[in-house]
Amino acid sequence: MRMFILLLLLAANPLWANGSISIAVAANFKPTLEKVTEPFLANTGIFVTYSAASTGVLATQILHGAQYDLFFAADEDTPQKVAAAKALPASDAFCYARGSLVLAGSEDGLSALAQPGQSLAIANPATAPYGRAAMEVLARPEFSAGQGRKLVKGNSVAQALQFWQSGAVDMALLPRALQAAGAVEVPLDWYQPVAQYAVVLNHSAAVDEYLQWLRSDTVRSLITDAGYEPCP
């Protein structure tokens, strides 16, 4: 009887018959990952689900037992720490993209960061690598005059973007890949490079097929088109 029910479920959900993958992904990369995955879904029928949040929040969930097959973080250290905590091979952590910062909402370029009257949104630096990069930029001496500004910290870069888009703040320091209209690029030497790493938490035939897809030239082009730099 149980086998009959299972066969009915597989018939009703043909994607499940080809396997499934559960992915935890840093909020900045979710839109790109969805675009990257669309051709994979069409070609394989493997079902992919996403859970997006800041890197720190996702790592905490994983270390407390949340079940995912892959974890796409927005930094290098967190996936390596997760791999070590779960006794996973170091080779299961890999670089998939390099990100950069932009300032959205400024009419005066980057000099607006020195204006205390301009409110600013960033991702929470305690849990989001792009938030930490933003704090490095704000700590520069030329922006010390702006230290009295209203600084709003979102739970993730996605929420920081929402704060700016809704008009709750004047400006936002965001990943370039979020493609905020009219944003100004922040020089790369103003903050530590944002190398984004992933880690394989659970190997399966579906996961291994997905990893092979991620290494393809097609995916590298999609990631570059989305506003990231490819890994070496």
Residue ranges and their predicted role:
Residues 1-7:
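Sec-dependent signal peptide recognition
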Residues 12-14:
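N-terminal signal peptide c-region/cleavage motif recognized by signal peptidases
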Residues 66-68:
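Short acidic/histidine-rich motifs immediately flanking catalytic phosphotransfer sites
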Residues 18-43, 47-52, 56, 60-64, ...:
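Exported/periplasmic ABC-transporter solute-binding proteins
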Residues 7-8, 63:
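Hydrophobic/aromatic side chains embedded in well-ordered alpha-helices
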